[in-house]
Amino acid sequence: MIRLPRPAARILLVDAAGRTLMFRFTPDDRPPFWCTPGGAVDPGESYEQAARRELLEETGLDRDCGPQVARRQVEFRTIEGVEVEADERYFRVDVDAHEVTGAGHTALEQRVMQSWRWFSRAELAAHAEPYFPTDLIDLLDATEPTHV
């Protein structure tokens, strides 16, 4: 099977309570799943620019996403049904609190990404529905800011 390359920026949005924002996807062709904010890098965009754009579009938060904190290569089928090999770059954004607005969601996102919530690590570990990345808890632990 040929997979299309898909550069993508993903955001680990973490509030002051240590909870991570996740979106619930309900595609027509598979069971629901949860995912961090983010998406494909548009032509001419850097990963950093894509992270900032995706953060604004999906959450309403307009700010710099800081440096890349992780990178993964993953294969999956997009919501549109395209088989891809994604080069995902992760950016961590820590906020005191944030009320998500879906005002920037595309028509497709409005249809398949109808809910979101903030998860603690314990809630993620006990959650019945799949979430991506599957090693999110380890990724959050590895990117936790250190205080000197």
Language model region names:
Residues 1-20, 40-43, 64:
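Conserved N-terminal beta-strand and adjoining loop/helix that marks the start
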Residues 20, 32, 100-102:
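Intrinsically disordered, low-complexity acidic/polar segments
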Residues 28-29:
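A short acidic/small-residue loop/turn micro-motif
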Residues 34-39:
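Conserved acetyl-CoA binding element of GNAT-fold acetyltransferases
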Residues 41-64, 72-129:
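Unchanged
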Residues 127-148:
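Charged phosphate-binding loop/patch that engages nucleotide di/tri-phosphates or the phosphate backbone
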